[in-house]
């Protein structure tokens, strides 16, 4: 039996590295691709030397050459946190456009099925709640967050064009807020920001009045959803996330309680176009994939905080 080969872009990132682990575990030959713009080599260091893992350092916006057959391609390369895409706005747009074009071209050439990592940010600051796949969104295309939102919307449009015009097998996942080990403490999103401040004994910064909501999905649950979607026969976008919604203020209080810190909450100005609500409607994922999250927020947070404590104490563990 010939071992099937999988290419994962953004392999050294938070999500990409967990996907590498999953596909190696499932018996695939995994080719990880990353240029380390925001990815961390430590996330995949444990895979080096594994005969079922190969790494290519490469910018996905340039021509991608992979020798031999590919069964699947998972496109997860992109700056994904506000700090990164505000620092790297043009690169963010390029990876969503040029990078996606290169990936889809490779999928066409290899006759490979490709899964594209989109995001709940395609819904922008939503006027419908919770958000379901048929909602077209409320996005400011020229706002500071627009570089990420529109890159992902373009990515979806190009993916569907390749599916319809070139008959490429495509899958699109819309990922909602996800957390777990290998997140960067400095990536600017609520969870690592709150945990980092708490562990350093600093006050926790809540933007606005903290009434805005998010829904946090543990990374293992997300990876299971990605795996099931890839193997499904469905080509339109599918939401994968945890519908357990919480306000940012209550979330900050949870982090304070979990870390046992004496940190106080301080309020800061809400950034432009920051979504007021975010909650996935996962009816489609339940129906199509038999998927729903299994890991509670309390369980997932404990694992994640333990990971961050080791990082702060200078012990790298992946």
List PLM regions with ranges.
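Short, conserved catalytic or interaction motifs in soluble domains
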Residues: 38, 181, 242
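Residue-level signature of the cytosolic catalytic core of signaling kinases
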Residues: 49, 143, 183-187, 244, ...
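Nucleotide-sugar-dependent glycosyltransferase donor-binding/catalytic pocket residues
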Residues: 78, 93, 183-187, 215
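A glycine/serine/threonine-rich, flexible loop-to-helix segment
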Residues: 129-130, 185-193
């Amino acid at each position: 039996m010939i071992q099937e080969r999988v290419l994962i872009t953004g392999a050294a990132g938070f999500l990409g590295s967990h996907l590498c682990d999953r596909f190696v575990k499932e018996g695939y030959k995994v080719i990880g691709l990353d240029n380390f713009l925001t990815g961390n080599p430590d996330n995949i260091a444990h895979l080096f030397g594994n005969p079922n893992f190969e790494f290519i350092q490469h910018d996905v916006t340039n021509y991608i050459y992979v020798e031999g057959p590919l069964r699947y391609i998972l496109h997860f390369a992109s700056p994904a946190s506000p700090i990164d895409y505000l620092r790297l706005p043009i690169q963010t747009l390029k990876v969503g456009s040029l990078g996606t074009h290169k990936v889809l071209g490779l999928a066409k050439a290899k006759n490979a099925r490709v899964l594209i990592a989109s995001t709940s940010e395609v819904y922008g600051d939503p006027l419908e709640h919770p958000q379901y796949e048929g909602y077209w969104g409320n996005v400011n295309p020229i706002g500071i967050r627009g570089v990420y939102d529109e890159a992902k919307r373009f990515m979806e449009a190009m993916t569907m064009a390749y599916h319809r015009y070139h008959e490429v097998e495509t899958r699109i996942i819309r990922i909602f807020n996800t957390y777990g080990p290998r997140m960067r403490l400095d990536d600017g999103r609520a969870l690592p920001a709150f945990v980092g401040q708490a562990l350093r004994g600093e006050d926790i910064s809540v933007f606005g009045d903290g009434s805005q909501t998010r829904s946090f999905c543990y990374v293992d649950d997300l990876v299971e959803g990605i795996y099931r979607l890839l193997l499904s026969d469905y080509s339109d976008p599918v939401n994968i996330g945890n519908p357990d919604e919480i306000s940012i203020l209550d979330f900050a209080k949870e982090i304070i309680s979990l870390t046992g810190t004496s940190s106080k909450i301080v309020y800061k100005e809400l950034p432009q176009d920051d979504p007021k609500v975010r909650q996935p409607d996962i009816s489609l994922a339940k129906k199509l994939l038999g998927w729903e999250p299994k890991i509670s927020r309390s369980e997932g947070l404990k694992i994640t905080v333990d990971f961050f404590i080791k990082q702060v104490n200078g012990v790298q563990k992946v």
